[in-house]
Structures are given as structure tokens and as C-alpha cells.
Design a protein with these regions (language model features):
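Catalytic beta/alpha-barrel core
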Residues: 30-32, 114-123, 186
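Structural preference for beta-strand elements that scaffold enzyme active sites
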Residues: 1-3, 27-30, 80-84, 114-115, ...
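Catalytic cores of alpha/beta
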Residues: 9-22, 100-104, 128-135, 152-159
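Flexible, glycine-rich active-site loops centered on histidine and acidic residues
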Residues: 10-58
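Conserved, mostly hydrophobic/aromatic
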Residues: 21, 108, 112, 145
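Active-site glycine-rich loop that binds ribose-phosphate moieties when present
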Residues: 94-111
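Active-site pocket-lining/capping segments in soluble small-molecule metabolic enzymes
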Residues: 34, 47-80, 85-94, 136-186
Length: 186
């Protein structure tokens, strides 16, 4: 599933990419806001671009109805995109709290997301708790768990810092016990 991000492109660029993807028969897309630029304190949308993934989902769903940015409606051309969005079992690092993070996820689903792919997690209880919170919030689309194997002891440092995820102590101990044997760590 190709990711499509808001950052670094305008709505017109996104529409062009979607037209190309549709022409090529790529009908699944993962709609993401994308990360902030390296030297910026927060995400800044591209000129005439989207600030949020929910806006990108709305644009994709409009194309599915044959509605294009210039206001034209092409009755003969309706795309058939299935749209996935990101969900965060441990909360998006930029969210004020888990409740606001869940509200934003619901906005993406209400905008037309067909499924959710979660950020990686290493404690299954966090995933199951997340699914339960989603269902209680009225989010009923499929929730696909994001999986990332730990293939090197360096991941014990890099993954939590980079992706704001936690690692269970039991897993940390098991990987550290493997030393530099990356095959055993896998």
C-alpha cells in the first residue's frame, strides 16, 4: 500500500499523484500527514497543501465521487480508492493526550478512512486496549496491527526514541541477552 503524505506537496500535486495511481490500477493508499521538516519545531503544511491527514482523506473520497479540485465533476471518472490511515496505540507523540488523539483518529475515519494501520507496538495489551477504546468511540473500521521485528540490539535505543513507543522490560532483557548475535535477536 503506497503512502501518500500531506507534507511537501500541494492539493494539486496530490490530485495528480492520485490520478496517476488510479490509472496504474493502484487503488489502496495510506493517507498520512507526514513528519515535520527537520529544522521546524512543528509540522507546517506546504503552500496550498493539507495540514491534516483527515483533509487528505476528504480529498481522496471526493475523487472517488468524481469531484476534482478545480470544481469540475466528471461523471465518467470515479476513482476507487480504499483509504487507510495511521492509528497510535500509545498515542501520537504530538497529541496532547490519548483522548484528543482518539478524537482526531475518529475524524479521519468519519472523513472516509476504510481501515487503520497502527504504529508499531511491542506489547500486545496496548494494541488490544487501543482497539477497545476505538470501538467505544464508535470507530468500527478494521484496525491492522503495525508490526516491526527487532533485528538488532540497536533497535532497543532507536525505536522508542524515534517512534515514541515503549518496549516491555521482558523483551529488552531477551534481546540484550543475545548480545551482538543479530540472528538470535530476530
Amino acid at each position: 500500500v503506497p503512502p501518500l503524505i500531506c507534507g511537501g506537496q500541494s492539493k494539486y500535486d496530490i490530485e495528480d499523484s492520485l490520478i496517476d495511481m488510479d490509472f496504474l490500477g493502484l487503488h489502496n493508499v495510506l493517507a498520512l500527514r507526514g513528519d515535520k521538516r527537520q529544522n521546524e519545531p512543528r509540522f507546517v503544511p506546504y503552500a496550498q497543501g493539507h495540514a491534516h491527514a483527515a483533509d487528505l482523506v476528504r480529498q481522496i473520497q471526493a475523487m472517488n465521487r468524481g469531484e476534482f479540485i478545480d470544481g469540475e465533476v466528471e461523471e465518467c471518472h470515479h476513482s476507487k480508492f480504499s483509504v487507510g490511515v495511521a492509528g497510535y496505540p500509545e498515542k501520537h507523540f504530538g497529541a496532547a493526550n490519548p483522548q484528543s488523539d482518539l478524537q482526531y483518529l475518529k475524524e479521519k475515519v468519519d472523513a472516509g478512512a476504510d481501515y487503520i494501520v497502527t504504529q508499531m507496538f511491542f506489547d500486545n495489551s496496548k494494541y488490544f486496549d487501543f482497539v477497545e477504546r476505538c470501538r467505544k468511540a464508535g470507530i468500527t473500521v478494521p484496525i491492522i496491527p503495525g508490526i516491526k521485528p527487532i533485528s538488532t540490539p540497536k533497535h532497543l535505543e532507536i525505536l522508542p526514541r524515534t517512534f515514541s513507543v515503549s518496549l516491555p522490560e521482558e523483551l529488552v532483557k531477551a534481546v540484550r541477552a543475545c548480545g551482538e548475535d543479530t540472528q538470535a535477536a530476530r
